[in-house]
Amino acid sequence: PPLLMPPALAAWASTAVVLPVDRALRREALAFLRANAELAPAVRAAGGADLAERLRAYAETPVPAGAHPEQVIAAILVIERDKDWRRERTRVAATQERLGRATAGQFGIPPTA
């Protein structure tokens, strides 16, 4: 299933400052969210609490008190995914702009729109 921002943490996430999360921890958190429905309740609760606590360390903006651990995991992963997407969009736009400048008017052919 797609990774969605938990509505309960959307307001927090819109202004939260989250430092880049270690790739191994991101993979572990994603794997947990994919498999959590199949885990025994005690294992799910303990694993979720542990991952949420480790991910909270990357949040410079404190996560709201009482937030469910699995919502914390999802929110921080969504923030990270969205930052990655914005970075990639910026990179692609810059590359296209450089390519456009580099090829504009070559060989006496006017650039096309």
Language-model-detected regions and their locations in the chain:
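Membrane-interfacial and juxtamembrane segments of integral membrane proteins
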Residues: 1-113
